[in-house]
Amino acid sequence: MPGDRGALSSPAASSGSPSAAPSGIAACPPPPSPLARASPQASGPRRGASVPQKLAETLSSQYGLNVFVAGLLFLLAWAVHATGVGKSDLLCVLTALMLLQLLWMLWYVGRSYMQRRLIRPKDTHAGARWLRGSITLFAFITIVLGCLKVAYFIGFSECLSATEGVFPVTHAVHTLLQVYFLWGHAKDIIMSFKTLERFGVIHSVFTNLLLWANSVLNESKHQLNEHKERLITLGFGNITIVLDDHTPQCNCTPPALCSALSHGIYYLYPFNIEYQILASTMLYVLWKNIGRRVDSSRHQKMQCRFDGVLVGSVLGLTVLAATIAVVVVYMIHIGRSKSKSESALIMFYLYAITVLLLMGAAGLVGSWIYRVDEKSLDESKNPARKLDADLLVATASGSWLLSWGSILAIACAETRPPYTWYNLPYSVLVIVEKYVQNIFIIESVHLEPEGVPEDVRTLRVVTVCSGEAAALAASSLGSQGTAQDGSPAVNGNLHLQQRCEKEDQEADWEGATGTTRCLDFLQGGMKRRLLRNITAFLFLCNISLWIPPAFGCRPEYDNGLEEIVFGFEPWIIVVNLAMPFSIFYRMHAAAALFEVYCKI
């Protein structure tokens, strides 16, 4: 009956009928009225609900910064031999901070075990398995380092305080529990006891940063002493050189064993340094995730496949083998005589220039492929990904500082040794290569995975609604499409998609014939193989460039030009501040590139 048909169609008309939409455009439900938005029954979150949590975040971050600043002052006081501050005082402070973190982790693990049956939200991007595997490897070497320190303490027990034996034991226990904690809870999104947990997590972050700073200081003092000994051997009488010797004032039995332990400790410090900074970054992501609402979008599991990367792997392994050979020759020749030192520096600069040129070219090719491919970006909020990008740029600043210092020293020097003209292109390439590599990595981690469904991508482009209406339109389109295949809304949506694709094709045909040919060449498997080879090569090269500065091959110390221009003490301070960030950059870039490889 006509009357019945009109009665049935009136609700659809009041809610926005598809047939009432303009031709060719998907209909959108009307936006909610202001009265509905202001009603108490509205499902939106209250504005004042997040104020206490924002206050807790601010308070906890300020607490952590105060702990860190106070700890840094203790480290500085010990480093400059301040009156009344000895090594035992510093170790007591660090031990107390570790014990406090241990208590919090035990409480958190125990409470999580009691609530193990509850379903908790997880951040699938945080604490990747390969990342936890890396931190486990570094933690194992850190425990070995602690064992060597305990053996060293036993050898010199007559003149060392008890804190120097307690500290490595506490650190070993702290390392074991922290690795267990990160394996089990790095993905947690804490939704209860949020204020207390913020303080516990941020305390853990800055405790690890202080342990990192302590390791960096010990390793830097050792490297500086070796550099001063080389200068004494080479006869630099115009520089006041005082060795900062912390050797105990008593005999060790047997002496040969104690000497071997002392040298072994400093060779393991680079791994301990990487462990502490890696743990602090994982804990920082956990802190940022407290109270966070998880994105309900489907997470694509990354599967790493190692087929089809023969070229990149062979080139990378060749660079790695050459790096080990260069470091061995450098450490043997440097400081033996003036001619041998200059030849060692020239060898290192030639090696580094070659590697940096290859890495820069690989990064440019990878970025060019992304420009040609024009894939959409994943703009969802991700604390782990944002931290990775921020750390890449921040830690690259350490190398940039050293490189610009070398360039300025070359420009201002009155006399220039032969290796100066190798140092100049090396310094320029360090700046350019990290600039290019950062762009490649950051763009790679922000690209959408290959497995994103096509209908999801189409919906992002085709939907013409705004605000809350967009989500309602998406759901209504899905339900109408299943109910009746010939729905005007669906047909209009497809018509709009076809029109957009036609316009894009016309634009591409007018101005990008060459780009289309590149796209034809780089379709599917060819593009992925090329990107994987580039990423594998850059991954191995970053590990290779981590080795020389981590194990004492530091031309910034040994070429002497910067020390003459800036002065010995000022330049040494700059190197000691910038070098830890430069070393960490290479390992962090390698970790980010591994994630990129698994994503491609």
From Swiss-Prot:
Stored Pfam families: Otopetrin
GO biological process: biomineral tissue development; cellular response to insulin stimulus; detection of gravity; inner ear morphogenesis; negative regulation of type II interferon-mediated signaling pathway; proton transmembrane transport
Recorded superkingdom: Eukaryota
Record's bilayer topology term: Multi-pass membrane protein
Quaternary structure note: Homodimer. Interacts with STAT1, independently of STAT1 phosphorylation status.
Function: Proton-selective ion channel. Biphasically modulated by acid and alkali, mediating proton influx and efflux in response to extracellular acid and base stimulation, respectively. Sour taste receptor, which carries inward currents in response to extracellular acidification. Sensor for ammonium chloride (NH(4)Cl) in taste receptor cells. NH(4)Cl acts by increasing the intracellular pH, thereby generating a driving force for proton entry through OTOP1 channel. Might also participate in alkaline sensation.
Protein name (database record): Proton channel OTOP1
